[in-house]
Amino acid sequence: MSYSLNSVIINPSSKSNPKNAVILCHGYGGDGNDISILANYWKNFLPDTLFVCPDAPEICKVNPAGYQWFDLMDQTEEETLSKSLIAENKLNKFIDEVSNKNKLSFNNIALVGFSQGCMIALQTALKKKDQIKCVIGYSGKILNIKHLNQNINSKPEIF
């Protein structure tokens, strides 16, 4: 099954159709393969869960072997926000694809993010009109609190 973002896909260990999906968003300069290590640990505890680990949409400017959700280098806060909105749209589309292709409700989808992946996961999930189950964030932050406060559409659980 292909998606708009190149992805590492770990199918349910139960071999059945997925009942849930976890989308894992890597950090700045990483890729889906890096963060798929978590999925390989978690799959035994969540046997009916599909794990999808996309590569961010841009080649990383600092580490061309990896990817970035948006550029962080030498920009104003407004430029960073503008670029993050592009990544947000791509991740939002990706979430919709995972839902549609696997016949899952949004309430059965979780986002996990590390570092920059946490930033884009929080921004996307809180602004998404169709509420997902939750966001689990590691070592991240809210990118632009003013923008986010003005655009919250849903309130998934956040861990």
Regions found by a protein language model. Name each.
Residues 54-55, 112, 136-139:
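Alpha/beta-hydrolase-fold catalytic nucleophile elbow
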Residues 112-117, 121:
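Gly/Ala-rich beta-loop-alpha elbow adjacent to hydrolase catalytic centers
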Residues 130-142:
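A conserved short beta-strand
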